[in-house]
């Protein structure tokens, strides 16, 4: 009630969700949580929310999960790729990229022109976008916000919890390691060498530091698989914006030109 934004975890279709999110008694959680999520969303009014799922190597057909979530009445939807070290059986690998990229293209075609679904990764503000510091640094973990455990321990974000080398302090003892915070504050698309010449750098902002650490053992080294997926999502987002703006569209016209300054017939 007090939060301006909430994130609701649901992986999509019943069989997909229940495989990854069983309850403590081993049964599926789908039938338990879906009605509650629907009730919460119906009471949100104008407050923001997202239904967020995770797709793994076991459901690379995640476009169907987005469609399923939309069919449940959820307008704001996000599905994120599972990330992890090379031996993680669920994490998306380099060999999965052709299937994942094809699925993003399929999803873009399905969502073209639709107003009932707001897919997070295709919702890109190409005209304005985030502020400059966000474009350069991204989420701000460790320097703009932190995660605090029930014991009061402070970490750069929730994904670093349990990694003692990234424990920044404790709210009860009052200590705080500014050196760790400084390391995160220095991260940006220019200090991350792999990001400097990437065309997507001002929208990706260097990716997720926790994912970088998990995959490469270095918060400064981007996860190459995640980078490829981000570029594909942005490509789809740009295409959808271009189509919505009528750029290059010649359907139902006799004109083959994409430059409307060549003639004035379209304005007649």
PLM region descriptions:
Residues 14-18, 86-89, 207:
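Short acidic/His/Gly/Ser-rich catalytic and metal-binding motifs that mark active-site loops
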Residues 17, 119, 139, 168-171, ...:
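Short clusters of hydrophobic/aromatic residues that line enzyme substrate/ligand-binding pockets
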Residues 21, 158, 208:
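Short, flexible helix/strand-to-coil boundary loops that buttress conserved ligand/catalytic motifs
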Residues 7-9, 50, 78, 138, ...:
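Structured core elements
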Residues 87-163, 203, 254-255, 259-264, ...:
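A C-terminal junction/extension of Radical SAM enzymes
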Residues 1-82:
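Radical SAM/AdoMet-radical enzyme domain recognition
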Residues 161-268:
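Flexible mid-to-C-terminal extensions adjoining Fe-S/redox cofactors in radical SAM and related proteins
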